[in-house]
Amino acid sequence: MNPDLLWLVVLALAVFAGILSGVPVLLAIAGAPTLVALIAASAGQFDLGYFQAVPQRVFGVMTNPLLLAVPLFVLMGLLLEKSQQAEKMLKSLTAALGGNQSALALAVVLVSALIAASTGIIGATIVMLGTITLPALLKAGINKHMSSGLICASGTLGQIIPPSIVLILLGDQISNAYFEAQQEAGNFAPDPVTVGDLFAGALLPGLLLVALYTGYVFLNLRGKASETDETAESPKSSLSELLKNIAPTLGLIIAVLGSILIGVATPTEAAGVGVAGALVIAAAGQGARAFWVASACAALAVLLLILRQSGLFGLEFAGGKIAWTLPTLTAVGAVVVLGALLAAVVMALPHRDVLGSALSETVIITGMIFGIVIAASILSLVFRGFNGDEHVSELLQSLPGGAYGMLLLTMLVIFLLGFILEFVEIIFIVVPIVGPIILQTDISPVWFAVLIALNLQTSFLTPPFGFALFYFRSVAPDTIRTRDIYVSVLPFVGLQLFALALVAAVPALATWLPDVLFK
């Protein structure tokens, strides 16, 4: 056997052994390759010079302006979650839809779509939905299978509905892979693939899934008109509560996503405005003083975005030094004022645990994501040190079916990896390896990215190892057995596979909107 192939097998076994051993994934992904590389180097089979690129990789991750959007979107979602927006929206939407079983179930799907779009974190969304909606669903007479499956499936919508953290990370890696692929093909000035392209490409498939879920719920619960507690409200009261509780969150998501899709703001800028808006929504339920101070903060954020577009905001340099021009002075002054307003928001909040809890969880989640990104970079370097990229290229190109044979095998591998790895590890390990090879063909990078997102979502929902099932198990009562959870998600897995097959068969579902908006 080729020595490189032997060491690649050892590398794969070491990484999976580390992951399955129970040590933190971060240590397994970084430590196992390092150990294998040191052993191989002692046998003269690996050049330790590859590790000289690690500091550059780390610096590149930390200075990537696109990845700066990740902690901002995480904070936006956590602010909405901690301020109990989901519970308020669920109650008012159920009442507005009629207050019966089907209304409650439909409300769960629609509210999940909104919350998933704002958080993009499967674990947080499913735990929140399980805590809030499961008792209400069971109390309304909806059986435990429908209730469990609905929560698990709805909680995974954050994988595909923009603005999604999965799509942001995919955008970074797909962009790099596409650029590398085009350079290999002799195109040294390819059109860039942006996160906005992926957001636009994932919008229709995401809405398709919401439509499939709502259709399934309606067909199964139609005619079951047992009333829930919310029907005591009058139609007028229901509508006013609906507008009061849903309009702010929906408006925030539309503003954030719309500003990216029409090219007014970058994902990072839009995420910053989203945090300001989420702060206002969170403060609105905690007293008038907090609301007005947070509103001033949000207004300043929007004003800064307008000034940025007009060229009146931003640091300018001359001769390697900061030039104290009007845009520079505006930027410095805005940072000072914005910092003062944020401090005022903290002081004005009667219940500061909302903001404090959101900030602390943001630090933990962001640290985990960036730690895994850096660890995956180390794994990638060791993999390339054993010429793994060349061996993968030879394997994929030898498959029958050409580009679509490569795509099918890649999707199968990603689906199986979804049982044991989180989306961050999969994106930063698999895409850099197979992306440059697959994207040298005529496969659209946007379509490829959307298929990966849908595939990950399906994998996380599929028994017996889907992550969504374990998250739900942690909040489900003892009366709902693990077997019940497995059975409950099977219809939704079928809907997921149908959506995945439809997008695979009709690429225009993923490519039409980006072409209309950006070309």
Which residues does each PLM region occupy?
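Alpha-helical transmembrane segments of multi-pass membrane transport proteins
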Residues: 1-519
